[in-house]
From Swiss-Prot:
Principal place of residence: mitochondrion
Binding sites annotated in the UniProt record for a ubiquinone: H201
Name the UniProt record assigns to this protein: Cytochrome b
Organism whose genome encodes this protein: Ochotona forresti (Forrest's pika)
Free-text remark on how the cofactor is bound: Binds 2 heme b groups non-covalently.
Transmembrane segments: 33-53, 77-98, 113-133, 178-198, 226-246, 288-308, 320-340, 347-367
Length: 379
């Protein structure tokens, strides 16, 4: 008799995705981040659901409802901090996952890659709206500053901003709709993640060498299920260490002050995972130019498959490209640092140089470098 997992319509899908899936025999720990992102999404949805049971999306009570969760709800503090720091873990995994894709040339699976970019935008939108919900000073002013950027769109900008606000400023209507969107988006993300996997399983996984691995495949279970389980253990350990020992390490103290439209914080800045994009936005003196650069800083990932000029897929055997890749990583870390600094000398010029280098590396240096490496192959 055939095993039920191979015949049952629902079990069959799970079987082909997670059990009998042929996987390359040599994929490294860098391939763990897909499953870790799934775990992060699961943690965020579960903790978020429990938070939503006690949260009120009203300007008068939002801040005190979060305080109530932390003080009066059983284990509310750990749920709240797991949700807040879970977002940080989510973005750490996201950045490493995208970095892996760039390094090993996984972007040549263009459908999977493009769905991934959509996922990145969706997660960023969700995180932004979630940051507004506690209705602290940074929540309010962050929402005001970022939504205001849409006013840079010619002709319809101002109307668009007021439409999103539901009034003439960030107020009760804005908070309520942000809560609604923050609740629904993770489920859209989960659906997109399934499409992401669907496209990935059409082609099969890439591997560190970038060479087609059809000749040497192994079953996903037990080899990669146990490997993923180890990754889960690491992630949960790191998350719990952060939550239990230093829950406010990555937060902003200003957000423990209730939102006050009459008092602007000295430095309005987003959470750490948006600082690189915020630095790019600030590095351009023109408002519309800044917004354009902000969107392009992520959207530029979509042109990576078109800019792949190398005869090899992976950077594993391309030392010059590797150097440029690590310069790009260092550049992003520099941008993250600059995003958290005040707008004054020398931070302004450093931010402008780092922003220029970011686009110049991806659009010019890396493709040219790949062409040079192609020539070196003929020696």
């Amino acid at each position: 008799m055939t095993n039920i997992r191979k015949t049952h319509p629902l079990m069959k899908i799970i079987n082909h995705s997670f059990i009998d899936l042929p996987a390359p025999s040599n994929i490294s720990a860098w391939w763990n981040f897909g499953s870790l992102l799934g775990l992060c999404l699961g943690i965020q949805i579960i903790t978020g659901l429990f938070l939503a049971m006690h949260y009120t999306s009203d300007t008068l009570t939002a801040f005190s409802s979060v305080t109530h969760i932390c003080r009066d709800v059983n284990y509310g503090w750990i749920i709240r901090y797991m949700h807040a720091n879970g977002a940080s873990m989510f973005f750490i995994c996201l950045f490493l996952h995208v970095g892996r894709g760039i390094y090993y040339g996984s972007y040549t699976y263009s459908e999977t890659w493009n769905i991934g970019i959509l996922l990145l935008f969706a997660v960023m939108a969700t995180a932004f709206m979630g940051y507004v919900l506690p209705w602290g000073q940074m929540s309010f002013w962050g929402a005001t500053v970022i939504t205001n950027l849409l006013s840079a769109i010619p002709y319809i900008g101002t109307d668009l901003v007021q439409w999103i606000w539901g009034g003439f400023s960030v107020d009760k209507a804005t908070l309520t709709r942000f809560f609604a969107f923050h609740f629904i988006l993770p489920f859209i993300i989960a659906a997109l993640a399934m499409v992401h996997l669907l496209f990935l399983h059409e082609t099969g996984s890439n591997n560190p060498t970038g060479i087609i691995s059809n000749a040497d495949k192994i079953p996903f279970h037990p080899y990669y299920t146990i490997k993923d389980a180890l990754g889960f253990l690491f992630l949960i350990t790191l998350l719990l260490t952060l939550v239990l020992f230093s829950p406010d390490l990555l937060g902003d103290p200003d957000n423990y002050t209730p939102a006050n439209p009459l008092n602007t914080p000295p430095h309005x800045k987003p959470e750490w995972y948006f600082l690189f994009a915020y630095a790019i936005l600030r590095s351009i003196p023109n408002k519309f130019g800044g917004v354009l650069a902000l969107v392009l800083s992520i959207a530029i990932l979509a042109v990576m498959p078109l800019l792949h000029t190398s005869k090899q897929r992976s950077m594993m055997f391309r030392p010059i490209s590797q150097i440029l890749f690590w310069i790009l990583v260092a550049d992003l870390l520099t941008l993250t640092w600059i995003g958290g600094q005040p707008v004054e000398h020398p931070f302004i010029i450093i931010g402008q140089l780092a922003s220029f280098l970011y686009f110049f590396l991806i659009l010019v240096l890396m493709p040219i470098c790949s062409l040079i490496e192609n020539k070196l192959l003929k020696w």
